[in-house]
Amino acid sequence: ATVRNTCYDYAAFAEKNSQFVMSSAVYATASGQEISAVTIPEECFQDQESGANLNPVVLYVERVVAKVRVKLDSDALETKTITENNQNYTMVALLKDNEKGNTPDNYLTVDGKQVYAKFLGWNVTAATERSSLSKFINPQWNIFTGWNYAPYFRSYWALNCEEAGTRYMPLIGSEGGYSVVGGRNLGTSYTSMYANENAAANSNFTNGLGRAYPSTVIMAAQLCDAAGKPINAYHWLGQMSVGEESLKTAMLEQLGRIDSKLYAKSVEGTQTVIKEIAEADLKMYTAVEADKATLTPEVTGRYYTYVMLSEAGEAKEWYSTPECTPESKMDKKAVNSFLNSTLGAAEIWNNGYTYYYFPIRHLGDKQNNGNEGYYGVVRNHIYQVNVNKVVGMGTPVYNPGETIIPEKPDNSDTFVSAKINILSWRLVHNNVELDWSVK
């Protein structure tokens, strides 16, 4: 029992050693009995090798890990390849409307330039950090049809170990750490990686429902023009444009239109100088940095960016009137609160960084339901993903080093279409459309 309960990062072991661990197949009999080991018949014990060879023990084993494979569908997407620093990248022309195809009037543009997604890599996020050596099931499960098939000595669902954990990652990480870009290249040929089992949580033992946060394929990209140059796009107050400096200028213009102002008092030589807030006083912060969101799946809006005082701005004295009276003095917190309430949040694709994602479907394309087993990763399966449509600009990333818990913007016009297959290894196909179109 101790060996069977061993909980370990078998996916990392497989990635590091190019080998995977196997264990006895686990399944349920027709009478509802769990089979997790093989009984060795008496006749298999022989005192001669020749006799043992005539009476072998029949074992059924399965890989402890799953495999995920992803590619871009060159037949369905408009793609081009560019080379940067001896590295090939696949660029995909982005669409505006999911209902339309690859037609000139449906290509997405910003400031008159057609926008491409230059894919930098992919990884599996929200994945479990560990899985058990031997699969655990509830033989009494009455869940999706075909979850168990005794004649093939197989079952197609599982319980996570108690120490499974959950791993999230940034777009670009430090050396040796997990990151989206540090996963696998994403192009028009399949690349693959191993993944730990991530099916049912122990708290859902009786009904076998999947985890609230299933393993998810996440794809890193840069928004680029046709030559591969990143587009620093932003979306603010319903307007889409390019350049962080342009955004700050627009925000200052907005402040100039309202009655309430911000004034800084400083001494230059022997003169007391009073100036309205300027671009050098402002800096953009992620929602997490601005304490507007936390890195927890239950919280949304992590993709937003907020303008607040820069270091230079924090060093100044701020007032709400040009007279700079003691009564009108504002501390840093009050100034930032005023900026947030007056200007709101922006979406900034800093250096063009963006991401697309989708949960891995365990039942694949042929089972169209959102119930038990629809999402999940089970050992000894291959989840084969074919991305055949990319609509919209993805979820904006301002700080590529900040941990990402995937989410789609509320006004998103982005969509990803993909197809997943699982391989004996059991193969599950996922055809996926990445749809981030504005609703």
Where are these regions (language model features)?
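Generic secondary-structure boundary signal with a strong preference for alpha-helix termini
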Residues: 392-393
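Ser/Thr- (and often Asn-) enriched beta-sheet segments in non-cytosolic proteins
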Residues: 2, 36-39, 44, 58, ...
